[in-house]
Amino acid sequence: GIAFAWKAGQWIDSDINNFKSLLWIFVAVSSLNAIAFWFMPKVETVKGSTNPFSAFKWLKKDKKFRVLIISWMLMGLGNLTALKIWTEYFANDQYGNGFSAFEVTLLTFIIPAGVKIIFTYPWGWLFDRMNFYVLRVILNVIFGAAILVVFYADSFWIIAIGTGLQGLAFAGGGIAWMLWVTKIAPPEHTAEYMSIHTFTTGLRGVVAPALGFYLLVTIGNSIAIFSAILITLASVVLIPEIIRSRKTNQL
């Protein structure tokens, strides 16, 4: 993926119309991915309720789950609001960057993906051994720092450090996103918990890009402050849970 992104960035730099061919490549690869998933062996899981709306009851019944969803919503909205506009921010001369397609590819994929590959295993090791709430706050701090560096840096390589930090945070964030439900959900209700988590992820994923572009046009790089505030709030709401979990030695 990194090697392909490297060549794709150079290819678009040579002729902007090459993006059309790239789109067909993406379609072909996505189709192969879908076929591979189709032939994966079925995994038998503990069956829960089949009512798609019944899962929402856990937001009311389970305080730990509710707090984590609120925290994740704040953090995700803050992070995605900034992240989804990076390509525009890096490529558009209006914001003082005007990087080439290859440079944008370096910043948005090659550097963060490379860092993510390197640090995924260490984060997985920490996930199994560290208090989850503390781990989540550490990840939030790294995400917030990455956004501030990217939007307030004055050189390509300082921005690259920021996108590298984003990759570092995503290495742990990806593991946390996929597995945190297993820390708190009863086995027979894991799918229901995950459905709410996925639903709220999609919700902020729809809102964040539109909000991000609106803020970029109206307040410029101060969008980083907006994101940092939301990410800080996401960490603050976890503090009571950190205290409680340490007293009870849970998570």
Question: Residue ranges of each PLM-predicted region?
Answer:
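Short amphipathic helix-loop junctions that connect adjacent transmembrane helices
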Residues: 84-104
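Loop-to-transmembrane helix entry/capping segments in MFS-fold secondary transporters
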Residues: 101-102, 187-197
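C-terminal membrane-cytosol helix-exit motif in multi-pass small-molecule transporters
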Residues: 27-46, 235-243
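Intracellular juxtamembrane helix-capping segments at the cytosolic ends
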Residues: 172-185
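Glycine-rich segments within core transmembrane alpha-helices of 12-TM secondary carriers
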Residues: 1-6, 198-208
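Helix-to-loop junctions at the C-terminal end of transmembrane segments
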Residues: 12, 118-131, 216
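Juxtamembrane intracellular "pre-TM" segments in multi-pass secondary transporters
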Residues: 42-70, 96
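Structural signature of the two symmetry-related core transmembrane helices
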Residues: 134-149, 229
